[in-house]
Amino acid sequence: MPPRTAAERGGRRKSVKAPPPVDPLVELTTLESVHDALAKAERLRNYFQVERDKVNDFWTITKGEVETYRNRLFNAEASIEELERSHQVEMKVYKQRVRHLIYERKKKAQACQDESDRLLREAEDRHLQRMNEIQAKLQQQDQQLRAAAADHEMNVYEKRDSHSYMVTVTKTQSHEKELARLQVSCEAKLKVLRDELELRRRAEIHEIEERKNEHINALIKQHEEKFHEMKTYYNQITTNNLEIIHSLKEEIAQMKQNDEHNETLMYDIDRENQNLVAPLEEAQREVAELQQKRKQNEQNKRGLEVTRVKLRSLREEIRRQREEHQALEERYACVHREREELKGKFESALRQAVMVVEERNEVLQQKLIESHALVEERDVQLEGVLRAMNLEPKTLELIATEVDEWLQRKNQLIKDLHFELKKGEKLYSATLLEMERRCQTANIASLPRSNFE
C-alpha cells in the first residue's frame, strides 16, 4: 500500500469535527459521583459477599448437624430394631422353654403318678398277700388246735373208759383214789395245756397284729415321704417358674426404661430440629420423614404391647388346649377307626374297578389282534383270487374300489377300537388319580401304581 500524501492527510484533518467544550466543574462533579457510586457498589459487593459466605457457612454447618442427627436417628432405629428382634427371639425361646417345662412337668407328674400308683398297688398286693398268709396260718393253727383238742378228748375218753373198766373190775378204794387222783391230774394237765395253747394263740395273734401295724405304719411313712418328695419337686418347679417370670418382668422393665430413654432422645432431637433454620425445604422434608419414622417406632411399641397381650393369650390357650387334649384323643381314635374302614372299602372298590378295566382292555386287545389277522388273511385271499381270475382292468378297478371301501370300514373299526382302548386307559388313569386324591384328602397312604400294572 503506497504512503499517503500531505494533501490527503490535510483533507483528513479538515473532515474531522472538533469536540464541544467541556466544563471542568461538571466533569469533576460527575467524576466524584462516579467514585461514590463505585465505592458504594464495592461496599455492597463486600457486604453481599460476606453475607453469602455466612449463609454458605451456616448452610454447611446446618447440613452437617442434620446429617449427624440423621445418623444418630438411624443408629437409634437400628438399635430399636435390634432390640425388637432380640425381644422376639427371646419371646420365642421363652415360649419354647415354657412349652418344654410344661411338657416335662406333665411327663414327670404322669411318671410320678404312675410310679406312686404302681408302688401303692404293689404295697396293697403285698399287704393282701401277707394278710392271706396270716389268715392261712391262723386257720392252720385253729385246725391244729382243734385236732389237738380232739386227740386229747379221745385220749381222755379212752383213759376214762379204761379207768371205768378198772373201777368196775377192781371196785377197790385204792383204785378209786387213784382214779380220782388221775382225773384231777388229767384235768390239771388239760387246763394247763389249754391255758398254754390259749396264751400261745394270743401271743401269736398279738405278734401278727403288731407286724401288721408296723407294716401299715411303714407304708404310711413311705407314702408320706413320697408325697413330701413330690410336693418338694412341684414347689421347686413353681419356684423356678416364678424366678423365670420375675426375670422376664425385670427384662420388660429394662425395655420400658430403654423406651423412655429413646423417647427422651427423640424429644431432644425433635427440639433441636425445631431450632434449625426453617427456610431449608429439604431439611423440613427430612424432619417430616423422621417424624414419620418416630410414628413407626410408636407403632412398633404398640406392637410390643400387642405381643405381650398375645403372650397372655397364649398362656390361656395352653391351659385351654390341655382341656381339649382328651377330647382330641377320643376324636382321633374315632377318626382312625373310620379311616381304616374307609381304607378297606376304597381298596376293595378300587380292586374291582381295576379288574373291570383290565378285562375290558384284554377284550379290546383280543379284538384288535383278531381284526389284524382277519385283514391279513383277506389280503392274501384277494391277491390269490385276482391272480387266478385274470380279470380286465375295469373289473379289477371295481374290485379294488370295493376292497378299498371294505378296508376303510375295517380301518374305521380299528380306529374305533383304538379309541375305546385309549378311553379305557384314560379312565384307568383318572381312577388312579382320583384314588390318590382321595387318599390325600383322607390322610391315607396311597398304594403304588406298580401294584395295578
From Swiss-Prot:
As for subcellular location, the record says: Cytoplasm; Cytoplasm, Cytoskeleton; Cell projection, Cilium, Flagellum
Q: Where is this region: Disordered?
A: 1-22
Task: State a GO cellular component annotated for this protein.
Answer: Golgi apparatus
**What are the protein's GO molecular function terms?**
microtubule binding; small GTPase binding
Can the keyword Metal-binding be found in this entry's annotation? no
Record keywords: Cell projection, Cilium, Coiled coil, Cytoplasm, Cytoskeleton, Flagellum, Microtubule
The answer to whether keyword Acyltransferase applies is no
UniProt signal peptide: none
Q: Pfam families attached here? A: GAS
What processes in GO biological process is this protein linked to?
A: cilium-dependent cell motility
Query: Where in the sequence does UniProt note compositional bias of the Basic and acidic residues kind?
Result: 1-10
What further fact does the record state?
Procyclic parasite mutants lacking trypanin exhibit a motility defect indicative of abnormal dynein regulation, but have an actively beating flagellum and are able to spin and tumble in place. However, bloodstream form mutants lacking trypanin exhibit a severe growth defect and are not viable. They revealed a failure of cytokinesis.
Family to which this protein belongs? Belongs to the DRC4 family.
Q: What is this protein called?
A: Trypanin
Q: Which organism is it from?
A: Trypanosoma brucei rhodesiense
